[in-house]
Amino acid sequence: GEPRHCLATNGTAAWQAEMTELLASSPFGKQAKVWPGKDLWALRSLLFTEPVDLLIGNSYGKYLERDTGTPLIRLMFPIFDRHHHHRFPLMGYQGGLRLLTTILDTIFDRLDRETMQTAVTDYSYDLTR
């Protein structure tokens, strides 16, 4: 998936221009919309009107996950509702591995939840990941 919404409560017009340029420079970011000065309530509305597959954010995103059913990947500061997540790297090689692992684990968790019906949706991926 490509990014769809990039939102920052303290985002300025300069930030919006910079992010728009950055996203437009990649074929994967051309569809993204940049939203400066918007809060979680605005993001909640966006998730209902223009749904996405995954949400990357902090602990406050858990309420959006509950309301919209969009799986949350906790990567940003602050993370209050998970133990020792502040110690995990976000930058460099180790951070990249952690990001990849976290995203894949979230996708696998969702796949497991959505494929529980015996002989209907129970694909045999359980032990081959």
Regions found by a protein language model. Give the residues of each.
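An N-terminal assembly and electron-transfer interface module characteristic of large anaerobic redox
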Residues: 1-129
